[in-house]
Design a protein with these regions (language model features):
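Bacterial N-terminal signal peptides
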Residues: 5-13
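Sec/Tat signal peptide C-region and signal peptidase I cleavage site
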Residues: 14-18
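Acidic-aromatic substrate-binding/catalytic surfaces of carbohydrate-active enzymes
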Residues: 19-72
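Beta-strand-rich recognition/accessory modules
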Residues: 75-76, 85-88, 174-268
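Active-site/ligand-binding surface loops and adjacent short beta/alpha elements
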Residues: 127, 140-201
Length: 268
């Protein structure tokens, strides 16, 4: 029996580190994905940067952001999962369960309006920092970033860029069906993505880092060496709760393999 117990412990250790992400941790609103094999050794995400109201495209950013706080509820001692809780002003509570999986990290959110009135909480912003991963600076890192269009995987420097907006810099890619009045007040591309994936290629060309949510407000190439797939909430009625799922993929540089993983998780 002692031998069997040792085998179980060994297999658990192997399973925990089977993929490139070996462990995760969350502290002071930063989610760190530790991945020793990839350039930079880890990927950090500002989680969460913001919860946002609708009508955001042509409005001062301060009027769009809904104040919130996030705290660590519980964490696995081996760094395989964390549980968080966000309290959003106006009576909204969000619980987050984030887990290491074989090809990255999974997110399961439940966001509930605990007030007696409808709340205009339209979308949220996790901000993934990719400067170390891509090995490039703010002016050119987007040349290693991509979305999927009708032409397939396309690097962002190959797409026409828009410059004019309430705030200059970056580029917003809006999925079909999302109101163009309700996204980031940065330049909005005329290119419509065909899925909810945005990602980038590592500086050594060996890895893809990508992110997606089942419901997405926007894909955003930002202004601090970051990329966003911003989950859509779509407002909450009094007492209403919604479930949202997301993924970070850290996989070998194979576009078809990434698409297969995305379709496994979210469908075509």
């Amino acid at each position: 029996m002692r031998f069997i117990g040792l085998v179980v412990i060994f297999l658990a250790a192997v399973t925990a580190s089977a993929g490139p992400v070996t462990r995760i941790e969350w502290e002071e609103n930063i989610l760190a994905l530790h991945a020793p094999e990839v350039p930079g050794g880890k990927v950090e995400t500002w989680y969460l940067e913001a919860f946002c109201r609708s009508g955001s495209t042509d409005r001062d950013w301060e009027a769009t952001v809904i104040p919130h706080t996030t705290r660590l509820v519980e964490a696995d001692g081996d760094g395989q999962w964390v549980k968080l809780e966000s309290m959003v002003q106006e009576g909204v509570r969000a619980t987050h369960e984030i887990r290491v999986v074989e090809d990255g990290v999974s997110f399961a959110l439940v966001i509930k309006n605990e007030s007696g009135e409808a709340v205009d909480v339209d979308w949220a912003q996790p901000c993934m920092r990719v400067g170390d991963f891509t090995g490039l600076g703010q002016e050119d890192y987007f040349s290693r970033c991509f979305i999927y269009t009708r032409a397939g995987q396309v690097m962002l420097d190959r797409l026409p860029r828009v410059e004019e907006a309430r705030y200059r810099g970056g580029q917003v890619y809006v999925p079909a069906g999302v109101d163009l009045d309700d996204v980031n007040p940065r330049p909005i591309s005329k290119e419509v993505p065909v899925n909810n994936l945005i990602g980038c290629v590592s500086s050594d060309g060996r890895w893809i880092l990508a992110t997606a949510w089942d419901a997405t407000q926007e894909l955003f190439q930002g202004v601090i060496n970051c990329i966003h797939a911003d989950p859509r909430i779509g407002g909450l009625k009094a007492g209403e709760a919604k479930r949202i799922t997301g993924r970070v993929y850290l996989v070998p540089n194979d576009s078809e393999g990434l698409l297969a993983a995305y379709e496994r998780d979210f469908g075509k």
